[in-house]
Swiss-Prot record:
Taxonomic lineage from the root: Eukaryota, Fungi, Dikarya, Ascomycota, Taphrinomycotina
Biased composition (Acidic residues): 60-69
Known function: Catalytic component of a P4-ATPase flippase complex which catalyzes the hydrolysis of ATP coupled to the transport of phosphatidylcholine and small amounts of phosphatidylethanolamine from the lumen to the cytosolic leaflet of the trans-Golgi network and ensures the maintenance of asymmetric distribution of phospholipids. May be involved in transport from early endosomes to the trans-Golgi network (TGN).
Family classification: Belongs to the cation transport ATPase (P-type) (TC 3.A.3) family. Type IV subfamily.
Regions of compositional bias (Basic and acidic residues) in chain numbering: 71-86, 358-369
Cited InterPro entries: ATPase_P-typ_cyto_dom_N, ATPase_P-typ_P_site, ATPase_P-typ_TM_dom_sf, ATPase_P-typ_transduc_dom_A_sf, HAD-like_sf, HAD_sf, P-type_ATPase_IV, P-type_ATPase_N
Native species: Schizosaccharomyces pombe (strain 972 / ATCC 24843)
PANTHER family named among the record's database cross-references: PHOSPHOLIPID-TRANSPORTING ATPASE DNF3-RELATED, PROBABLE PHOSPHOLIPID-TRANSPORTING ATPASE
Catalysed transformations (reactions): ATP + H2O + phospholipidSide 1 = ADP + phosphate + phospholipidSide 2; a 1,2-diacyl-sn-glycero-3-phosphocholine(out) + ATP + H2O = a 1,2-diacyl-sn-glycero-3-phosphocholine(in) + ADP + phosphate + H(+); a 1,2-diacyl-sn-glycero-3-phosphoethanolamine(out) + ATP + H2O = a 1,2-diacyl-sn-glycero-3-phosphoethanolamine(in) + ADP + phosphate + H(+)
GO cellular component: division septum; endosome membrane; Golgi membrane; plasma membrane; trans-Golgi network; trans-Golgi network transport vesicle
Extracellular side: 1-275, 596-614, 1331-1332, 1403-1414, 1465-1490
Designated name of the protein: Phospholipid-transporting ATPase dnf1
Domain of life: Eukaryota
Length: 1562
C-alpha cells in the first residue's frame, strides 16, 4: 500500500529512490540507489524495469523501510505491495521477470528477489563479496535470480565495462593497496573528530532538486530543504582547521609522534613519588613547551590561510537590492517625530513584505515564530536591515520611482539599485551584475547579455585549466525578458536545478516564470561557474544558484585535508620504538642484575643497612635513568632546522621569477625533506608546462614546407625536445624538406601570380582566413586588429593569415570581410572582399574537422575544411591515393624509428641496474683521475641514454641553434637540389619549375606533405590539414534542406548533423597543412628529462583534449621518438596508428575477440604488462581520457589492472580529466605503492584537489591567479624551478635531516651507554655517572648546537653537481641516507666509542690518580671527552660543507662547557654526593694527567671513526663519495656548472669563461 516516490503510468514508470524524484520513460523503469551514509564513493543501483503496460501494484508515497546490502542496514525508500494483491496472478509473474533487469553493483554481484516473509541474506567468499540486494513482497515463494540470468546495465549507456568483458589473469590483479594493514587508532580518532566538527552537508539529496524562488522584492534568505536552514554562505574555507577542531586535532597530531608519547609516559612515571632519580617535572615541563611551540607554528600557518580566504571573500560584487527610499537618508531638518514615524512605517512594510512567499506547495512555509524579514544589508546575508548609506553604483538608477522626488517620505514602491557587497554575502536567489574581466563569485544562470545573439565569453582556466575562451549563449526567452533592471525587478517564478555536485560538464534544470507559459529548460550552456572570468562581455545579469562550498569549483576541492607528515617520520618513529624497547631491556637487565648483586654482595656489606629496594621502583629508576637516549628535543630541534631551511629556500635567487615578482614560498615546512624523496610527479599542462601561447611555426603547401617568419627563433622559443637533437643521429630526415621562410614564399607568389603553385598558395591562405570562428575587433589605440576565439589554435592561424596578407577585418552572423594586401610592400593597395557565410559545420570530436561554406564575391559557393589528417584524407577526391602514400610514409618512418627503439632497449637493458659510478672499485683515490678524465664522456653517455644531445663545452651556443634545412626533392624525387637556404634569390627560374612540376604530380605532392606532417608531429607540433571544394548551386540547395531538417530535429540532432556533414564534405581538393606550437615554458623539456634521469615517473593530468595532450607530450619529452603510446579504449591506440602513436613502437597485441571497449582495454593492459615484464618496451606511455577513466572506475578488477599497469609505465597522460579525477589518480598511486612519494604541481583552482591529495603539493603563481599557490605546500614562479627545488633544496633537506636524526641518536646513545657500562661498578643501583646539573644542560648547551648546525648547513654536494647529474637524486628515492642499515652503523660507532672511552679513562685515570679519583672527577673527565668527541665528529667528519658558522658553534659549545665547570666549582653546594665545589679550579683541573687522559681518549675515539669512514669509502664508495672527490678538480666543477647553467642562472659561467679556462688548462 505504500511506496516512496513511485508513480504509476499506463506505459510504465520510473522512480529514483535516492533523489526521491519521479521521472517518466518510455520503457518504464525505476532505479533503486543505495548509498552508504557519509560516503560518496560507493553506490549500489538496482534498475527494475516493467515492460508490461499495466502496473500490478497499489502504491502510496510516504514510508521508508530498510534493506540489508553487504550485511549493513541502510535506510532506503522501499516498495510495499498491497496486501490484497494476488501474488499468484499472471501479473505477479510478469513483475518477477521484470525484476531481472539489474544495473551495476560495485563488485561481483548477484541479485535475489525475495517474496514476502523472506529475510535478507548475504553471501561472501574470500576477498570479493557476492552481494545480494533484496526486494521483499508480502507473501509467496522465494525466487532467486542467478547472476548468469541477469542482464547488467549501466547508468551511462556508453559505459563499456560490464558487457562480456574477458577474465583478467590473477597475476595482474595482485593488489598493492594497503588495505590489510591495521588502521592507526589516532588517525581514526582524527578523522572522527574532523567529521564531527566539520560535517559536510553538501552531498545531501533533496526530494525535488533545489528550488530557488525568483522574487526581487523579497530579500530574505531562502531555505535549503535538505537542512531546514538558509543556503550555504558564499564564503570559502581553505584552512585546514577551524576554532572547534584545531586543539583536539593538533593534540592528536602531536602525539602521533612516537617520541612525544614516549616522553609523556616518562613524565607520568617521574611524577610518581619515590620513583624518579632526576626530579619530578624535568620532563613534563619541557615536553609541554616543545609541543606548544609546534602547535603554535601550525596554528600560524593555518591563520595565514584564513587571512588569504578572507581577502578572497571580501571581493566586491554588485547585487540587485532595494530600499524604501532612494537613498534612505533622512533630511537633516526633519523633525524628531517625523523621523520616528518614518522608521515605524518602514519596519511595518518590511515585516509584511517578508511574508510574501511563492505559492509553490513544495516551498516550506514560514512559521509564526519566525521573525519578520527586513531588507538585507549588502554586507551580511543574515542581517535584516540595510545600512543607512548603501554603496550605490555610480551610474544613475535604472528604475525611476516617484519616491526619489521626496527623499524623507516613505512610499509604496521600493527603489532598486546595484549594491556593492562582499562576495561572501552573495546568496542563492540573488541577481548579480558583472562586467568584463570580472570573476564570477558563484555558480549562476545567465539571464542577459548585450552581445549579439546573447553570446557570453568566459575563460574557465580556474576550473579545467583551459585559458581559451568559451562561448555560452543566453537562452533567447530569458534574454527577451531580462534586458534591463526594469525587466529584472518584474521577474517572478521558480528555478529548479540539480543538487550540488562536482560535475563540470553536465547540468540539468528548468525555470518556470509567471509571465510565460511552460518551462524553460536549462543545460550546461546556461550556467556559468564560480572562478570563471568574464571576457569581451560588457555586462551580464545572472541568477545565483550555488554558493560557497557548494559551487562546482569547491565541490571539486578536497575537504578535510589531512595533516601531511613526512615519510622520514615513520622511520624515526620506528627507531624511537626500538630505542624504547632497548631502554626497557636495559632496565630489566640492570634490575635483575641488581637483585643478583644484592643477594651475593650487598648482604655481606655491614655498612649498607635498610637499603633494599623493591622491583618496581628499581625498574622505573633505570628507565628514567636511560630515558634520554631518546632526546626530548628531537622533534622541536627538527622544527628549528626546518625554519632555517625555509629561510634558505625562500631566499634563493635562482627560484625568483622577476616577471611577476614571485619568489618561492614555503607554506608547509614540515615536509621539506619530502622534496628529496619524490618518486612520482603529477603535473597539470596548461599554465604549468605551457604558457598557453600558440605559435604558428610551419606550413606545407604544394609539396614544400616553409618556416613562418612570424615565429621566433626556434632555439630561443622552441620547447620541442628536438630543438637540441638535430645534430644527433636521431635527426628526422623529413625536416630537411623545409625550403625557406614564408617571406620567400610570398615573394615568389607576388612575382609569379598566375602559376598553378601560386594559385594553390592563395587558396590555402584563404582557407586559413575563412575556416574559423574568430571575432575581430579593432584596437583604436594601437591601430591593429585583435581577435577573440574559443580556440587558441584558431587564434594562431588567424594571426598567421594576417601576417601573410589575409586580414580578417569584420565578421557578423552571415558575412566575413577580408582585406588582402602584399605584406612585403607597405605601399601596396589593400583590397577588401566580403564572403557570405552560408553554413558553419562545427568541429566535433567524432568528425575531427570543421567546415565553413561561403559564397565567394564572384558568386560561386566553396566549402573550406580543416581538421586532423585522418579526417581530411578520407574526405579527399583522391583519398585512395592519399591513403596509400600516407601508409608508405608511415611505414618508412616507423622503420627508421625502429632502429632508435632497438638502441633504446639496449640502453635500458644495460642500465637496468642503474649503472653509476658505484661499482666495486679497489681504490677510490687510485681511480679518481680516470673519473675526472672521463667526466665529459660520462655526462654525454647519460644524456644519450635519455635520448638527449646537447652541445659540448667548447661549442658556441650560437652554433648549436637549429640550422635551417634545405630541400632534397627533385623532379625525379629524393635527391637534394639545394645546399643553401637562400636559394630562392639565386635560382628562381629553376625553382619555379620545380613547384609547378609537383602540382601536376599528386602522388609526389601527397608523399612530401605527409613527410612534412610526420616531421612536424615528431617535432611536437600540432598539425592540421586543409582542403576545399567548389559546390554547385543545386547541390548546395539540396544539401541545405537536409541540414536544416537535422537542425530542427528534436531527437538525435547531432547524429543527423554529422550525417548531413558527410554528404557535403566529400571529394575535397587537398590544399596543405599547418604546424602550430603550443609554446612550453622555458626549460620544461630539460626539466622533464632531468626528472626521468633522476628515476622520477612523470604523469601529465590535464583537462585538455587528447590530441593536444599527446602533442604536448611530444614537445616536452614525455613521449620520445621510440615511445610506445597506448591510448586506452582506442582500437587505433592498439594498432599504433598515426593518430595516437606518432612513429612510436607498435605494441604486439592480438585482436580482441570483440570490439567491446572493456575487452579492448583488458587486452591492452595485459599486453603492456607482458611487454614490461619481458623488457621488450623501450619506453611506455599510457594515454587515457576522463570518460574512459570514469568507466574503468566502475569495474574494480579492471581499475586495479589499470593502476598496476600505469605505475609500471614510464609515463601516463590523462586528458579531459576533472579535478576529482586528478586527485583520484594521485590517491591511487599513493595507495598502490607504499613507498611512493607523490608530488602534484599545478597553477589553477582545478588543480587544488590534486595538490592537496599528494604528499607534496606545489602551486605555480601564474596567469591563472593564486588559487593553487595558496592551497599548496610550496609555490614557485615557473616549472623549471622545480628542478632546483627538488635536486638541491629537497636533496639537501633530506640529507640534513637524515644526518641530524642520526647524529642525535648517536650522541645520546654514545653518552648514556657509559651510564650502563658503569653500573657493574656501583652494584646496579642506578647511580649516575654524571652530575645532575650537567645532565640537565647536556641536550641544550653542550651537544645540541653542533648537530643542529649539521642539520641546517650541510651540503654533501654542490648545487651544480646535483643538477648536472640528476642520477644523484636517487639517494633520497632509495632512502640511502636514512635507513636501518645506516642507523645501526652509527650505533656501532657509538657502542665502540663508549666502551673505549669508559675503559681507557678507567685504566689511565680512575685507578691510578688516588688524589682525584672520586666519581665527580672521573665523571667530568668522561663528560668532557664525550662532548668533544661528539662535536668534533659532527663538524669535521660528518659535515662535507664546513663553514665559519659551524666553527663558531663548536667554539661556543666548548666555551660553554668550561664556563659551566667554572660556575659549579664556585657555586656548587657543599653537602652533595658529588664533591664538585672547587674541584675543577683547584684539584683535577690542575692535574695534567686529567687533561692528557682526555686528549688521548679523544684521539683514540675519533681515529676509530676516521678509519671506519676511510675503509667504507675505499671498499664501498657511494655516488656521493665519488662526486665529492671529483668536485675537488676545477675542470670538473666548471663542467658541472656549465651543464646546470639552465637552472642556476645566478651562478652559471658563460661559454667564453669555460673556453678561456680550458685554454689556460692546456
Amino acid at each position: 500500500m505504500k511506496s516512496s516516490g513511485i508513480a504509476g503510468d499506463s506505459n510504465g514508470f520510473e522512480t529514483n529512490f535516492l533523489n526521491e524524484t519521479t521521472n517518466r520513460e518510455e520503457d518504464g523503469a525505476f532505479n533503486w540507489n543505495a548509498a552508504d551514509d557519509g560516503t560518496n564513493e560507493r553506490r549500489e543501483d538496482i534498475h527494475v524495469r516493467f515492460q508490461d503496460s499495466a502496473l500490478p501494484l497499489g502504491i502510496d508515497e510516504n514510508e521508508l523501510d530498510e534493506i540489508d546490502i553487504n550485511g549493513d542496514s541502510k535506510k532506503l525508500d522501499s516498495v510495499e505491495v498491497d496486501e490484497s494483491h494476488d501474488v499468484n496472478s499472471p501479473s505477479d509473474s510478469r513483475l518477477k521477470s521484470s525484476f531481472k533487469s539489474v544495473l551495476e553493483l560495485t563488485a561481483n554481484s548477484m541479485v535475489s528477489v525475495l517474496t514476502p516473509s523472506t529475510k535478507t541474506e548475504q553471501t561472501s567468499k574470500g576477498k570479493g563479496k557476492k552481494k545480494k540486494a533484496h526486494v521483499s513482497f508480502l507473501e509467496g515463494p522465494v525466487e532467486e535470480i542467478p547472476l548468469d540470468d541477469i542482464e547488467p546495465t549501466s547508468p551511462r549507456e556508453a559505459s563499456p565495462v560490464f558487457n562480456g568483458r574477458p577474465p583478467i589473469p590473477p597475476e595482474f590483479l595482485k593488489s598493492r593497496h594497503k588495505e590489510f594493514t591495521i588502521p592507526n587508532p589516532l588517525q581514526f580518532i582524527s578523522n572522527f573528530l574532523s567529521n564531527l566538527f566539520s560535517r559536510d552537508t553538501r552531498y545531501l539529496k533533496s526530494s525535488h532538486g533545489r528550488i530557488i524562488i525568483i522574487n526581487p522584492y523579497d530579500d530574505s534568505s531562502q531555505i535549503d530543504e535538505r537542512t531546514g536552514k538558509p543556503y550555504m554562505q558564499n564564503s570559502i574555507v581553505s584552512s585546514r582547521y577551524n576554532k572547534y577542531n584545531f586543539v583536539p586535532l593538533q593534540i592528536i597530531a602531536q602525539f602521533s609522534k612516537t617520541a612525544n608519547c614516549y616522553f609523556l609516559l616518562i613524565a607520568i612515571m617521574q611524577m610518581i613519588p619515590g620513583w624518579s632519580t632526576t626530579g619530578t617535572y624535568t620532563t613534563i615541563i619541557p615536553l609541554l613547551i616543545f609541543i606548544s611551540i609546534a602547535i603554535l607554528r601550525e596554528g600560524f600557518d593555518n591563520y595565514r590561510r584564513y587571512r588569504q580566504d578572507r581577502v578572497e571573500n571580501r571581493i566586491q560584487t554588485q547585487v540587485l537590492r532595494h530600499v524604501d527610499v532612494d537613498p534612505p537618508i533622512v533630511e537633516e531638518h526633519s523633525s524628531f517625530f517625523r523621523r520616528r514615524r518614518w522608521r515605524r512605517s518602514r519596519s511595518q512594510e518590511s515585516a509584511s513584505r517578508s511574508t510574501i512567499r511563492s505559492t509553490d506547495e513544495r516551498e516550506p512555509e514560514r512559521t509564526s515564530e519566525d521573525p519578520p524579514q527586513l531588507p538585507p544589508s549588502p554586507s551580511s546575508p543574515s542581517s535584516p536591515a540595510l545600512s543607512v548609506k548603501p554603496n550605490i553604483d555610480p551610474q544613475p538608477p535604472l528604475y525611476n520611482s516617484t519616491l526619489t522626488t521626496t527623499r524623507s517620505i516613505p512610499a509604496n514602491k521600493p527603489t532598486f539599485f546595484w549594491a556593492s557587497c562582499d562576495r561572501k554575502d552573495v546568496r542563492v536567489g540573488d541577481i548579480i551584475r558583472l562586467t568584463s574581466d570580472q570573476t564570477l563569485p558563484a555558480d549562476v544562470i545567465a539571464l542577459s547579455s548585450p552581445n549579439p545573439n546573447g553570446a557570453i565569453y568566459i575563460e574557465t582556466a580556474a576550473l579545467d585549466g583551459e585559458t581559451s575562451l568559451k562561448t555560452r549563449l543566453v537562452n533567447s526567452t530569458l534574454r527577451s525578458l531580462c534586458k534591463d533592471i526594469n525587466d529584472l525587478i518584474r521577474l517572478s517564478g521558480t528555478c529548479t536545478v540539480e543538487d550540488p555536485n562536482g560535475d563540470l560538464y553536465n547540468f540539468n534544470g528548468s525555470m518556470k516564470l509567471d509571465s510565460i507559459q511552460g518551462e524553460i529548460p536549462l543545460s550546461n550552456n546556461d550556467v556559468l561557474y564560480r572562478g570563471s572570468n568574464l571576457r569581451n562581455t560588457s555586462e551580464l545579469f545572472a541568477l545565483v544558484i550555488f554558493t560557497g562550498e557548494e559551487s562546482k569549483i569547491r565541490m571539486n576541492a578536497v575537504r578535510n585535508v589531512s595533516v601531511k607528515a613526512p615519510s622520514m617520520q615513520k622511520v624515526t618513529n620506528r627507531i624511537v620504538i626500538f630505542i624504547f624497547a632497548l631502554v626497557v631491556s636495559m632496565a630489566i637487565y640492570c634490575t635483575a642484575a641488581y637483585f643478583v648483586w644484592q643477594k651475593k654482595v650487598e648482604r655481606k656489606l655491614w655498612y649498607l643497612t635498610n637499603s633494599k629496594l623493591s622491583f618496581v621502583p628499581i625498574l622505573v629508576s633505570f628507565i628514567i635513568l636511560y630515558n634520554t637516549m631518546v632526546p626530548i628535543s628531537l622533534y622541536v630541534s627538527m622544527e628549528i632546522i626546518r625554519v632555517f631551511q625555509t629561510f634558505l629556500v625562500q631566499s634563493d635567487i635562482d627560484l625568483y621569477y622577476p616577471e611577476n615578482d614571485t619568489r618561492c614560498e614555503v607554506r608547509s615546512s614540515s615536509i621539506l625533506e619530502e622534496l628529496g624523496q619524490v618518486t612520482h610527479v603529477f603535473s597539470d599542462k596548461t599554465g604549468t608546462l605551457t604558457d598557453n601561447i600558440m605559435l604558428f611555426r610551419n606550413l606545407s603547401v604544394g609539396g614544400f614546407a616553409w618556416q613562418h617568419v612570424g615565429a621566433e627563433n626556434p632555439k630561443l622559443v622552441s620547447t620541442s625536445q628536438k630543438s637540441d637533437d638535430l645534430d644527433g643521429e636521431a635527426k628526422p630526415p623529413q625536416l630537411e624538406n623545409i625550403q625557406g621562410t614564408t617571406i620567400q614564399l610570398l615573394q615568389y607568389v607576388h612575382d609569379n601570380p598566375h602559376t598553378t603553385f601560386s594559385k594553390r598558395v592563395r587558396i590555402f591562405l584563404l582557407n586559413l582566413a575563412i575556416c574559423h570562428t574568430c571575432l575581430p575587433s579593432f584596437d583604436e589605440e594601437n591601430q591593429i586588429y585583435k581577435y577573440q576565439s574559443i580556440s587558441p589554435d584558431e587564434l594562431a592561424l588567424v594571426h598567421a593569415a594576417q601576417q601573410l596578407g589575409y586580414i580578417v577585418i569584420d565578421r557578423d552572423i552571415d558575412s566575413l570581410t577580408i582585406r588582402l594586401h602584399y605584406p612585403l610592400d607597405p605601399h601596396s593597395h589593400p583590397i577588401a572582399k566580403t564572403y557570405r557565410i552560408l553554413n558553419i559545420i562545427e568541429f566535433t570530436s567524432k568528425r575531427k574537422c570543421m567546415s565553413v561554406i561561403v559564397r565567394m564575391p564572384n558568386g560561386r559557393i566553396c566549402l573550406f575544411c580543416k581538421g586532423a589528417d585522418s579526417a581530411i584524407i578520407k574526405r579527399l577526391r583522391l583519398s585512395n591515393l592519399a591513403k596509400r602514400k600516407d601508409k608508405s610514409v608511415t611505414k618508412a618512418e616507423q622503420a627508421r624509428k625502429s632502429i632508435e627503439i632497438d638502441k633504446a632497449i639496449i640502453r635500458n637493458s644495460q642500465s637496468t641496474s642503474r649503472p653509476s659510478l658505484t661499482a666495486s672499485r679497489p681504490s677510490l683515490s687510485r681511480r679518481r683521475n680516470d673519473y675526472i678524465n672521463n667526466v665529459t664522456s660520462w655526462l654525454d653517455e647519460r644524456r644519450e641514454k635519455m635520448g638527449v644531445v646537447r652541445p659540448r663545452a667548447s661549442t658556441s651556443i650560437l652554433e648549436t641553434r637549429r640550422r635551417p634545412a634545405v630541400g632534397r626533392h627533385s623532379l625525379a624525387g629524393g635527391e637534394r637540389l639545394m645546399e643553401d637556404k637562400k636559394y630562392l634569390s639565386k635560382q628562381e627560374e629553376a625553382e619555379g619549375s620545380i613547384y609547378e612540376s609537383l602540382n601536376h604530380n599528386d602522388a609526389k605532392l601527397f608523399e612530401n606533405t605527409f613527410e612534412h606532417v610526420h616531421a612536424f608531429a615528431t617535432d611536437g607540433l600540432r598539425t592540421l590539414m586543409y582542403a576545399h571544394r567548389f559546390i554547385d548551386e543545386s547541390e548546395y540547395q539540396s544539401w541545405k534542406l537536409v541540414n536544416d531538417a537535422a537542425l530542427n530535429s528534436l531527437s538525435n540532432r547531432q547524429q543527423l548533423l554529422d550525417e548531413a556533414a558527410d554528404l557535403i564534405e566529400k571529394d575535397l581538393e587537398f590544399a596543405g597543412a599547418t604546424a602550430i606550437e603550443d609554446k612550453l615554458q622555458v626549460g620544461v623539456p630539460e626539466s622533464i628529462n632531468s626528472l626521468f634521469r633522476a628515476g622520477i615517473k612523470f604523469w601529465m593530468l590535464t583537462g585538455d583534449k587528447k590530441e593536444t595532450a599527446i602533442n604536448i607530450g611530444h614537445s616536452c619529452g614525455v613521449i620520445k621518438e621510440y615511445s610506445t603510446v597506448v591510448v586506452m579504449g582506442s582500437l587505433d591506440g592498439v594498432e599504433g596508428s598515426d593518430e595516437t602513436v606518432s612513429g612510436g613502437q607498435r605494441l604486439s597485441l592480438d585482436r580482441p575477440p570483440t570490439n567491446d571497449p572493456a575487452s579492448l582495454m583488458i587486452h591492452q593492459l595485459i599486453s603492456c604488462m607482458n611487454a614490461i615484464h619481458s623488457n621488450s618496451l623501450a619506453h611506455l606511455v599510457i594515454v587515457i581520457d576522463g570518460s574512459t577513466l570514469a568507466d574503468i572506475e566502475n569495474d574494480p578488477e579492471l581499475f586495479l589492472l589499470f593502476i598496476n599497469t600505469a605505475v609500471e609505465a614510464d609515463s601516463v597522460i590523462c586528458c579531459r580529466s576533472s579535478p576529482m579525477q586528478k586527485a583520484l589518480m594521485v590517491q591511487k598511486v599513493r595507495n598502490t605503492l607504499e613507498k611512493a612519494v607523490t608530488l602534484a604541481i599545478g597553477d589553477g583552482a582545478n588543480d587544488i584537489a590534486m595538490i592537496q591529495e599528494a604528499h607534496v603539493g606545489i602551486g605555480i603563481a601564474g596567469r591563472e591567479g593564486l588559487q593553487a599557490a595558496r592551497s599548496s605546500d610550496f609555490s614557485i614562479g615557473r616549472f623549471k624551478f622545480l628542478i632546483k627545488l627538488l635536486f638541491c633544496h629537497g636533496r639537501w633537506s633530506y640529507v640534513r635531516l637524515s644526518k641530524y636524526i642520526l647524529g642525535t641518536f648517536y650522541k645520546e646513545q654514545f653518552f648514556f651507554l657509559m651510564q650502563a657500562i658503569m653500573q657493574p661498578f656501583v652494584g646496579y643501583t642506578g647511580q649516575s655517572l654524571y652530575e645532575s646539573w650537567g645532565l640537565t644542560c647536556f641536550n641544550t648547551l653542550f651537544s645540541s648546537l653542533c648537530v643542529i648546525g649539521l642539520g641546517i648547513f650541510e651540503k654533501d654536494l654542490s648545487a651544480s653537481t646535483v643538477i648536472a647529474v640528476p642520477e644523484l637524486y636517487q639517494k633520497g628515492i632509495n632512502n640511502e641516507a636514512f635507513n636501518w642499515r645506516v642507523y645501526f652503523g652509527w650505533c656501532s660507532i657509538a657502542f665502540i666509542q663508549a666502551f673505549l672511552v669508559f675503559y681507557v679513562t678507567y685504566s689511565l685515570f680512575g685507578m691510578k690518580e688516588l688524589n682525584d679519583n672520586n666519581i665527580f672527577a672521573y665523571g667530568q673527565l668522561i663528560f668532557t671527552a664525550a662532548i668533544f668527541i661528539m662535536n668534533f665528529k659532527l663538524v669535521f667528519i660528518e659535515m662535507q660543507y664546513i663553514n665559519i658558522i659551524s666553527i663558531i658553534v663548536l667554539v661556543l659549545t666548548s666555551l660553554a662547557w668550561f664556563l659551566f665547570n667554572i660556575f659549579i666549582s664556585e657555586h656548587y653546594p657543599d653537602k652533595n654526593l658529588y664533591l664538585a665545589r672547587s674541584q675543577f679550579l683547584h684539584h683535577f683541573g690542575k692535574n695534567p694527567s686529567w687533561w692528557l687522559t682526555m686528549l688521548f681518549v679523544m684521539v683514540c675515539a675519533l681515529t676509530i671513526d676516521i678509519v671506519a669512514q676511510m675503509l667504507r669509502r675505499t671498499l664501498r664508495p657511494t655516488d656521493t663519495d665519488i662526486f665529492v672527490e671529483m668536485e675537488n678538480d676545477a675542470f670538473v666543477r666548471s663542467r658541472f656548472e656549465q651543464e646546470s647553467g639552465e637552472f642556476l642562472q645566478a651562478n652559471a659561467p658563460s661559454v667564453d669563461e669555460i673556453e678561456q679556462y680550458l685554454k689556460s688548462r692546456d
